[in-house]
């Protein structure tokens, strides 16, 4: 699997695969054949074969452990088992529902990082797979929820919105109310009175040869559906006269169809009249699931002279009723007053609300029922009711629309005219009852008359109500219908999703057993503890790394502070030394000028002053100044036997007194721990007793004779002697200057090709033993330098194989010999070929990487050099342990030994890499047990 963690369950073996020496992969030491454990191609000590986490020793013969990609061993108690593949998880896991999993996608098995994954049904998915699962889930939810429009195809929803709107009264067939039977009107108004049915899911129902508008997949076009609703007229037209409000925008928007122009149904045009039989075929069955329809009703308007327009000759109206003046119906309008129309405009969203529809229909019906005459004994009241109640110049909404005269159905007119006496006879005979004593009582004639007139009145009222809804309430645009259709589809989708979620939650609740509060609390606490433990384990490696970095930074800061302090001390020390050197230089220049002046005077004098026998005439008495010193000529003359006369008259007095000024050298030496006490030049130089003579001493030199310097005979002995003294002094000075100690480098100890040591020299071992025996608490150990004479003596002793030094030897001289021997090696202890690998390992940021790099460099050294380096580093670690007494910490020791142990082959990077070398050597001293484990 590619989840980032691969387990290697290799077979274990206690046998050595080869006869060569094997090294433990953990401790880097050789493993004897009796305690070797082989696993995954690597060798371990039997004691090193432990769990990395709990440090538990593992049994090689069992299989209760596993290995990750980093070659680390884990026991089964320290790792989790994956819920998906039942294999151990060695690195980190992904927890879902208190179950651990590999950090990989459950679908494509790709490794998941912490910023790009999600959980779905208890499984982990990457983002592409999660989107795919979401789409499949949404598709399943939409397929399971019937009757709603999928939200993913909004364009298709917008295209089919007009089909749904056609069922809601915006694009409907047109009919004449007077030619429709009562059953048709009652059925349609019954459907209209239940507006909540429009919110039900629509199914595919085959009606009148086409699929209902509720089917969004209907392949029929709008024109085909229009043809099914608007049938061809059969040469029957009713001519209407123009009305005052026929040209108004509200009238056109309320009555015009989106499929036709507004002029097709304008006042004065031909209105198609459908036969009753053809319209009955298009009536929706009450048992079907088709949405209720509120159709448009067109009512004929009277002419200006008060007469009705005439029908064609083949169509006639039997006994048309006279014009009646109807009473005004107090119906509360839902029209808004913000429309530019004079008579208001009803918003499509408000008009389509089921609450408004139901309330409007209820108000109209109640008003119609209240208009029935209560005094049934009075025919005059009944006649007045029919005269005043059926016609009005105002609509129920008080919008003052054109009058809607009542046009009686031909079937009802025939039924009324077929009665024995007729309507006029009944109206005439009704006056007899008014004068009778029983005028207020009910009789069968009045009841029958009321029953005969009530259906006609109800039809007329319903026609008016239908006209109210079609002309005023359902005044909406196609855009609002589209918005409503989209909103209904969204709500249906949400309802389906909520139903599925409720069903799943109910099933889960039924399956689960009731849990007590205490048990639930315990389970919750256990789950939280598990999650906290998981978080602690997941953050533990990062915290360990941060802690190591913090310690490294703290160490670096402390080292930098110590280095800064040391630099400041050395700077102060150098300033003091510089001041001393300046004063010494000035004094030497004055002495040199004085000597040159004296020599010039002697050469230009007529006689050789110091060999003149005349003590009084040619003697020059000079009192030397306090800054005078012996000349080289006087020193050589004294060594050759020319002794000056002793002057006992004057002895040294005040010049031998101690200088009263403060000795700055001692104070600075005590403060800054100077390596060695150097002669401090005071402002007043010390003068010997021989130089305090008040008179110049004279020696007797013969004029002719042999020279005591070169042994030659000369007639001008004085001049020859002067030249010989000068040449002798120069030879002695040059021989003394060229003297240098000879170090004991035995050629047999080196490889002639690589110039590396073949064995550990006895000088190194002897010096280390002497220092650890007598000088561990010596202040300034390895910092102070010894005298050259003592160094020569120690080298002579060690050359004669006298490895045991006397305790009286100078510690500083021994340390100087030790350092000088390491400095004079032709190839340093850390050889030239390992210089750059050593610098690379020192630049590693991680502690473990740096440690591994130093170990690899040490293993690459020649055996003798690796052994000497281990001997020196362990010795310096023991010296640093006494830093409270000798003031030599690991940092100070690294500064002293890094130039001798680590050298650049070209001597070009000594200054650049000086800080890195010092830090690296201090690291080796501080971690000697880890490096040389």
Curated annotation (Swiss-Prot):
The record marks 783 as: Arginine finger. Pfam families: LIM, RhoGAP. Residues 325-338, 619-628 have a biased composition (Polar residues). GO terms for molecular function: GTPase activator activity; metal ion binding; small GTPase binding. Residues 643-652 have a biased composition (Basic and acidic residues). Keywords: GTPase activation, LIM domain, Metal-binding, Phosphoprotein, Repeat, Zinc. GO terms for cellular component: cell cortex; cell division site; cell periphery; cell tip; cytoplasm; lateral cell cortex; lateral plasma membrane; medial cortex. It comes from the Eukaryota. Residues 22-80, 81-129 form the LIM zinc-binding domain. The modification Phosphoserine is found at residues 353, 625, 738, 740. This is Probable Rho-type GTPase-activating protein 4. It comes from Schizosaccharomyces pombe (strain 972 / ATCC 24843) (Fission yeast). Residues 181-200, 304-338, 415-435, 605-628, 641-660 are annotated as: Disordered. InterPro entries: Rho-GAP, Rho_GTPase_activation_prot, RhoGAP_dom, Znf_LIM. The keyword Endoplasmic reticulum does not apply. GO terms for biological process: establishment or maintenance of bipolar cell polarity; negative regulation of cell integrity MAPK cascade; positive regulation of establishment of bipolar cell polarity; positive regulation of establishment of cell polarity regulating cell shape; regulation of actin filament bundle assembly; regulation of cell wall organization or biogenesis; small GTPase-mediated signal transduction. Residues 753-932 form the Rho-GAP domain. GTPase-activating protein for Rho-type proteins.
């Amino acid at each position: 699997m590619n989840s980032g963690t691969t387990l290697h369950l290799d077979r274990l073996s206690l046998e050595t695969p080869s006869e060569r020496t094997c090294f433990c992969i953990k401790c880097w030491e050789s493993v004897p054949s009796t305690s070797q454990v082989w696993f995954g191609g690597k060798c371990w000590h039997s004691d090193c074969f432990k769990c990395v986490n709990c440090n538990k020793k593992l049994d090689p013969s069992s299989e209760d452990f596993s290995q990750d990609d980093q070659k680390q061993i884990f026991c089964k108690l320290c790792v989790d088992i994956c819920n998906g593949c039942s294999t151990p998880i060695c690195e980190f896991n992904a927890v879902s529902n208190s179950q651990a999993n590999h950090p990989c996608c459950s679908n494509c098995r790709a490794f998941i990082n912490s910023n790009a994954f999600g959980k779905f049904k208890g499984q982990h998915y990457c983002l592409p797979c999660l989107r795919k699962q979401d789409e499949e889930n949404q598709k399943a939810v939409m397929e399971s929820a019937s009757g709603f429009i999928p939200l993913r195809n909004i364009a298709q929803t917008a295209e089919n919105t007009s089909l749904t709107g056609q069922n809601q009264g915006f694009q409907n067939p047109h009919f004449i109310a007077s030619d429709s039977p009562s059953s048709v009107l009652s059925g349609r108004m019954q459907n209209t009175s239940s507006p909540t049915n429009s919110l039900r899911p629509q199914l595919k129902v085959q009606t009148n040869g086409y699929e209902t508008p509720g089917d969004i997949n209907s392949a029929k076009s709008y024109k085909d559906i229009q043809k099914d609703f608007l049938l061809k007229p059969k040469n029957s037209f009713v001519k209407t006269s123009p009305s005052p409000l026929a040209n108004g925008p509200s009238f056109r928007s309320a009555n015009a169809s989106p499929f036709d122009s507004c002029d097709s149904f304008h006042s004065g045009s031909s209105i198609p009249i459908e036969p009753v039989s053809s319209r009955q075929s298009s009536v929706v069955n009450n048992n079907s699931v088709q949405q209720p329809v509120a159709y448009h009703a067109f009512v004929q308007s009277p002419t200006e002279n008060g007469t009705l327009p005439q029908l064609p000759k083949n169509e006639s109206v039997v006994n048309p009723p006279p014009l009646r003046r109807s009473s005004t119906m107090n119906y509360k309008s839902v029209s808004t007053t913000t429309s530019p129309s004079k008579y208001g405009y009803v918003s499509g969203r408000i008009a389509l609300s089921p609450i408004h529809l139901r309330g409007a229909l209820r108000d109209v019906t109640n008003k119609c029922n209240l208009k029935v005459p209560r005094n049934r004994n009075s025919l005059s009241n009944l006649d007045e009711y029919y005269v005043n109640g059926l016609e009005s110049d105002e609509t129920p909404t008080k919008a003052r629309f054109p009058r809607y005269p009542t046009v009686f159905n031909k079937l009802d007119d025939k039924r009324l005219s077929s009665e024995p006496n007729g309507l006029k006879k009944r109206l005439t005979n009704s006056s007899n009852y008014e004068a009778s004593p029983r005028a207020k009582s009910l009789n069968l004639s009045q009841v029958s008359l009321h029953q005969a007139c009530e259906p006609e009145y109800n039809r007329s009222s319903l026609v008016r109500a239908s006209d109210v809804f079609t002309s005023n309430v359902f005044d909406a645009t196609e855009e609002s219908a589209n918005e409503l259709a989209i909103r209904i589809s969204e709500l249906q989708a949400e309802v389906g999703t909520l139903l599925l979620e409720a069903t799943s939650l109910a099933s889960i609740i039924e399956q689960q057993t009731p849990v007590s509060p205490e048990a639930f609390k315990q389970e919750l606490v256990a789950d939280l503890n598990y999650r906290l433990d998981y978080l602690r384990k997941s953050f533990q490696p990062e915290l360990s790394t941060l802690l190591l970095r913090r310690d490294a930074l703290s160490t670096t800061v402390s080292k930098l502070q110590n280095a800064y302090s040391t630099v400041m001390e050395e700077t102060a020390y150098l300033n003091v030394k510089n001041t001393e050197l300046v004063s010494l230089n000035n004094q030497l220049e004055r002495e040199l000028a004085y000597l040159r002046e004296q020599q010039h005077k002697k050469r230009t004098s007529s006689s050789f002053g110091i060999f003149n026998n005349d003590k009084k005439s040619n003697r020059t008495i000079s009192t030397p100044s306090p800054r005078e010193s012996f000349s080289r000529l006087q020193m050589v003359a004294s060594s050759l036997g020319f002794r000056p006369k002793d002057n006992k008259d004057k002895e040294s007095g005040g010049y031998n007194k101690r200088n009263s000024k403060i000795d700055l050298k001692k104070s600075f030496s005590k403060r800054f721990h100077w390596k060695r006490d150097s002669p401090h030049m005071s402002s007043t130089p010390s003068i010997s007793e021989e130089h305090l003579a008040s008179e110049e001493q004279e020696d007797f030199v013969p004029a002719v004779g042999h020279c005591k310097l070169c042994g030659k005979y000369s007639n001008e002995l004085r001049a020859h002697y002067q030249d010989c003294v000068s040449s002798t002094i120069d030879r002695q000075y040059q021989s003394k200057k060229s003297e240098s100690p000879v170090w004991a480098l035995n050629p047999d100890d080196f490889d002639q090709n690589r110039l590396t040591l073949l064995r550990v020299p006895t000088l190194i071992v002897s010096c280390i033993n002497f220092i650890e025996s007598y000088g561990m608490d010596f202040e300034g150990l390895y910092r102070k330098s010894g005298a050259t004479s003592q160094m020569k003596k120690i080298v002579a002793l060690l050359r004669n194989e006298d490895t045991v030094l006397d305790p009286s030897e100078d510690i500083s001289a021994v340390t100087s010999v030790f350092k000088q021997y390491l400095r004079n090696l032709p190839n340093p202890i850390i050889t030239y070929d390992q210089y750059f690998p050593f610098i690379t390992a020192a630049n590693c940021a991680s502690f473990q990487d740096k440690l591994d790099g130093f170990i690899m460099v040490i293993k690459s050294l020649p055996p003798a050099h690796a052994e000497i380096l281990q001997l020196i580093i362990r010795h310096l670690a023991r010296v640093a342990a006494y830093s409270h007494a000798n003031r030599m910490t690991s940092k100070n020791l690294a500064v002293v030994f890094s130039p001798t142990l680590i050298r650049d082959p070209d001597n070009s990077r000594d200054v650049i890499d000086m800080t890195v070398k010092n830090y690296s050597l201090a690291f080796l001293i501080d971690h000697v047990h880890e490096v040389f484990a």
